[in-house]
């Protein structure tokens, strides 16, 4: 994960001093976050209207320039991000678009727009509680009673992650075969609320986004703590689907597309969390020293 961040930083520095140019163009808002915090309905595609992408540092952070125009959010706010690494990653999204801009592929831009505009008007406490609420319907806490092969598969693949989370955070996370789901102790919620409070609102937007993709807070925590890779987390979130596919077969192209899309969204969300937490974490460590 961090090697990927460094490659983005090093490979993208050319964007910082790239000369602006090309025909003038009016700015178009980028994509925005899907459920659970959907608020915008941008076009899915449009013809590319810029030639060059560059980054400049302003008073409020790092800005993205498309030719000589500054990128803005759907609510017409200046698109400004808190770190150079995140700016490079977003600029790379825009620079990698070909003749057609495919907004639905630009997940980092989506998350930045949501963080800047806050279309649902939620504060930090509300973001934290929205993320913790995923425990109530956490994918890996819902178990089947049959067939035995799937029961065993869920036990072998999901139990180690639950055990890791319980040990890592000092909490209790149970599983259940009931349609009502497991009963999550109040202490578990309190501990996770306290833990998530250490993140800034940008990172919390990313955490909720990843949890929504995986339908699991436990798997999201595993990703953040580098206990799981993106590929592992996605496969664990789709354990029953993959079991059924292996048993009954699938429409190959549809399955492959869905899997790749889920990986892309999850990877982007996880990268967003780390890039938004980086400066805060470093500052916290320096203060402690």
Swiss-Prot record:
It is a peripheral membrane protein. Keywords: Chaperone, Disease variant, Membrane, Mitochondrion, Mitochondrion inner membrane, Primary mitochondrial disease, Transit peptide. It holds the Pfam family ATP12. The modification N6-succinyllysine is found at residue 133. Its main location: mitochondrion. Residues 1-40 form a transit peptide. It is found in: Mitochondrion inner membrane. GO terms for cellular component: cytosol; mitochondrial inner membrane; mitochondrion; nuclear speck. Residues 13-40 are annotated as: Disordered. Plays a role in the assembly of the F1 component of the mitochondrial ATP synthase (ATPase). Interacts with ATP5F1B; involved in the assembly of the F1 component of the mitochondrial ATP synthase (ATPase). Interacts with FMC1. Belongs to the ATP12 family. This is ATP synthase mitochondrial F1 complex assembly factor 2. The gene is ATPAF2.
């Amino acid at each position: 994960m961090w090697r990927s961040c460094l490659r983005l930083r090093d490979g993208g520095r050319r964007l910082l001093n790239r000369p602006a140019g090309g025909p003038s163009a009016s700015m178009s808002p980028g994509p925005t976050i899907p459920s659970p915090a959907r608020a915008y309905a941008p076009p899915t595609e449009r013809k590319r209207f810029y030639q060059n992408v560059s980054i400049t540092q302003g008073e409020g952070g790092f800005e993205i320039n498309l030719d000589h125009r500054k990128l803005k959010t759907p609510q017409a706010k200046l698109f400004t991000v808190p770190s150079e690494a995140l700016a490079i990653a977003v600029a790379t999204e825009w620079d990698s678009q070909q003749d057609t801009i495919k907004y639905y592929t630009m997940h980092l831009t989506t998350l930045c727009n949501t963080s800047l505009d806050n279309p649902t008007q939620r504060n930090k406490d509300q973001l934290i509680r929205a993320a913790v609420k995923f425990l109530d319907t956490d994918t890996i806490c819902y178990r089947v009673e049959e067939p035995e092969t799937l029961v065993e598969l869920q036990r072998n693949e999901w139990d180690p992650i639950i055990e890791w989370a319980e040990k890592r955070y000092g909490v209790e996370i149970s599983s259940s075969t009931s349609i009502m789901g497991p009963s999550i102790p109040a202490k578990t919620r309190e501990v996770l609320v306290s833990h998530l409070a250490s993140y800034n609102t940008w990172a919390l937007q990313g955490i909720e986004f990843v949890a929504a993709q995986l339908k699991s807070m436990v798997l999201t925590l595993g990703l953040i703590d580098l206990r799981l890779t993106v590929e592992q987390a996605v496969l664990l979130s789709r354990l029953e689907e993959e079991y059924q596919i292996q048993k009954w077969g699938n429409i190959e192209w549809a399955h492959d597309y869905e899997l790749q899309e889920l990986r892309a969204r999850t990877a982007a969300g996880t990268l967003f969390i780390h890039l938004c937490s980086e400066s805060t974490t470093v500052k916290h460590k320096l203060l402690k020293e």
